[in-house]
Regions:
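A Lys-centered signature of the CheY-like receiver
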Residues: 10, 108
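Two-component/phosphorelay signaling modules centered on CheY-like receiver
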Residues: 12-33, 100
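Helix N-cap/capping motif at the beta->alpha junctions
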Residues: 34-43, 64
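Active-site residues of response regulator receiver
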Residues: 56, 86
């Protein structure tokens, strides 16, 4: 099954790195959608179906907090899995998102293997990549 992925981060470099990690991790990606903030992400969701959303928290304009709150209140989007990819790790910041229905979070910087394991747990499949492609780098 090919997955449509929405990556939301104000850094174009980070969005490109996440795309690369998903590719080398063996996920069957149908289409990538990208937004630099929550407002762009909502515009994408209005016109496209996505299977998972990977979002930063700290972005200009509509941040990740407002984005997650909007998604989880919207009847068409509330069941789309959301994974935060953020520099935050403090429970007082992360726990409210988990209580809202966010599936998980990945702390930046991250290892490609971390994304592969967490998304495999959510999406249920990934091809095991060549270890030499993922073990030697952090993003």
């Amino acid at each position: 099954m090919a997955y449509n992925v929405l990556i939301v981060d104000d850094s174009a470099t980070m969005r490109a790195l996440i795309r690369k990690v998903l590719t080398i991790s063996g996920f069957d990606i149908g289409e990538y959608f990208e937004g630099a903030n929550g407002q762009e992400a909502l515009g994408i969701l209005e016109h496209n179906w996505v299977d998972i959303i990977l979002s930063d928290l700290h972005m200009p304009g509509m941040d990740g907090t407002a984005l997650v709150q909007t998604i989880k209140k919207h009847e068409m989007w509330r069941n789309i899995p959301v994974v935060l990819i953020t520099t935050e790790s403090r429970p007082e910041v992360i726990d409210p998102f988990l209580n809202l229905g966010v599936q998980d979070y990945i702390q930046k910087p991250f290892r490609p293997e971390t994304i592969r394991k967490k998304l495999t747990g959510i999406l249920g499949e990934a091809i095991t990549p060549d270890a030499s492609e993922t073990e030697s780098c952090d993003f």
